[in-house]
Regions:
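Extended hydrophobic/Leu-rich segments
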Residues: 1-4, 152
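Non-catalytic, usually N-terminal nucleic-acid engagement modules in DNA/RNA processing proteins
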Residues: 3-120
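Active-site-adjacent beta->alpha loops and helix N-cap segments on the catalytic face
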Residues: 49-58, 111-123, 140-144, 164-177
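A structural motif corresponding to the C-terminal end of an alpha-helix
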Residues: 92-103, 121-130, 151-152, 178-184
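Glycine/Thr-rich beta-alpha phosphate-binding loop at enzyme active sites
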Residues: 131-187
Length: 187
């Protein structure tokens, strides 16, 4: 059963799920697309690919935005100064934050630098915004997921779903139900 099917079994879709379109900012046809599409609803952008003029156009045409750190883009062999990149991302967040932006994903690169370092990077981001979205990974353990829901009660959290490596589709409902207990919205 897919995560969508599991979610449907336990929840009504009326006003409960927003689907964010992604990849627009990295498209070579961005300006052509924006000429054809007068309004976007929900957009997820990667900080890694964002250029200021493209961001301003997406922001102008969108109801809501979520910004990804772009950390996953680096997992293809590039050497990165994670602290420097995070500071640059944090400064961009401070400069560009608006009510229209739902949140900003943390630097969830546990597999590269370890969870303790990720927590240090999260502090850099949280010093600039209270809309940082923590991303739970299996290596963090179930107790960390529960603590994350409690600590971020009423906010947006994320559960990694990349290639079903961390949790299986049929397990998502259990995570979503637990997060809902703390009024967390789940990406």
């Amino acid at each position: 059963m897919s995560s969508l099917s599991a979610y449907r079994q336990g929840h009504s879709f009326q006003k409960s799920m927003k689907i964010f379109m992604s990849g627009l900012e990295a498209s070579g046809e961005f300006w052509d697309i924006t000429k054809l599409v007068p309004k976007f609803k929900y957009i997820l952008c990667s900080f890694y690919y964002l250029k200021d003029d493209i961001f301003q156009e997406i922001k102008r045409k969108s109801d809501l935005l979520i910004i990804d750190s772009g950390a996953h883009s680096f997992q293809k062999g590039k050497k990165v100064d994670w602290v420097e990149y995070t500071k640059k991302y944090a400064d961009w967040i401070e400069k560009n934050d608006s009510p229209q932006i739902v949140g900003y994903f943390e630097m969830d690169v546990d597999n590269l630098i370890g969870y303790e370092k990720v927590l240090e990077l999260r502090k850099i981001l949280e010093a600039k915004s209270n809309k940082i979205i923590p991303v739970w990974h299996k290596n963090r353990g179930i107790e960390d997921f529960k603590k994350m829901c409690q600590d971020y009660s009423g906010k947006v959290i994320a559960i990694t779903g990349f290639k079903n490596e961390d949790i299986k589709d049929e397990q998502y409902l259990m995570f979503v139900k637990y997060a809902k207990k703390y009024s967390c919205k789940v990406h």
